[in-house]
């Protein structure tokens, strides 16, 4: 099933496309949070800290793969908007073949580097072995991560945001059930959570592939469909690499911040791990709203409809800000209650609640930055998204280190460092955005 987003009323079109993406990420975040909740409740503080300190590295690998898929998806959206279905087929086939080879090699590399990477993060010796085992199991399943993200990106590029949601719902239920079985029943600890995550991703990937084979005529998966276009690969890699590096840059900044957190004690580590899971409920849906904007803009860019690109941006920003406002209310007033879902220790709950109350007041900033980045991806200017992300991380990490190590601030130092990075990001992105809105000049024009 595909959807042409170059015609029709923009506001309802974008809202309908966005809702399944947001719901899908909420389900994904739910089963990610289930790892922390179940480990925290049934294993203990050290296991929760091990899972939490592994999460930034795991997310880095996933986001890098997702960035490659997102870059390919932008090209597919543009070709689909232009009505060139043959080009769509070649793009998807070439990206699938290259991505499979890359993800296998990347998975092996990540497994081999798990221990030195965790040591680089200054993970305490008492939880290092547990964190290594958890991370290696997750990294072993990166091939499934690639296939799901790639197939979902292709479906989104063709205007279908609903199908991946249904598969993710099934995967979420399987993951939570697997967590309970492996951790509570079999007492496999954090390794059980990691195994449950890999198995649920594999099932989600399989469901997506079956659906596309039988329900998406433009992508008739099979031997005849497989085509590898070397020239086209260069363009796919160009877009995918810029998008992947942008995603990876953001996560590397988070990893550097995690290294600072790891010097603040196990209680702060556990609180930050739990609060970060909750915090993801703000950031990830904001990113998905931006992905919806990207799809709409890329299709209309391919069709040469500049006015629809502009209106799609304005509508997307409004949706971003409304969502941010709702999350601010929930996280500010419900901070302690939410933290109790993740931890039993009073100190962990109190530290996490302080983090959530402060960061929730800043959710409007990533709403703006994500929306603007979705805009630039949609018009094909991925260099701006990469540079602004690098600028943000270059500001966030030193400011966090300064506040913690020099001014001896506690967990509140982290939200303030985030805000500093977001402000600089906006300062860089807003001028070229305004120039486009005034002149309507797209990339390479």
Show where each model-derived region lies:
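Short alpha-helical transmembrane segments in multi-pass integral membrane proteins
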Residues: 1-18, 76-141, 185-241, 297-362, ...
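Transmembrane helical elements of multi-pass membrane transporters/channels
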Residues: 16-35, 137, 148, 171, ...
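Small-residue-rich hydrophobic transmembrane alpha-helices
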Residues: 48-108, 145-164, 271-335, 366-380, ...
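Residue-level hotspots within the lipid-embedded alpha helices of multi-pass solute transporters
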Residues: 25-29, 63, 103, 107, ...
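N-terminal transmembrane alpha-helices
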Residues: 5-42, 56-71, 75, 100-107, ...
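Alpha-helical transmembrane segments and their lipid-water interface positions
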Residues: 28, 32-39, 62-69, 73, ...
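Helix-terminus/linker motif at the lipid-water interface of multi-pass membrane proteins
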Residues: 26, 30-49, 118-125, 181-190, ...
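Short runs within selected transmembrane alpha-helices of multi-pass transporters and secretion channels
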Residues: 69, 137-156, 164-172, 193-208, ...
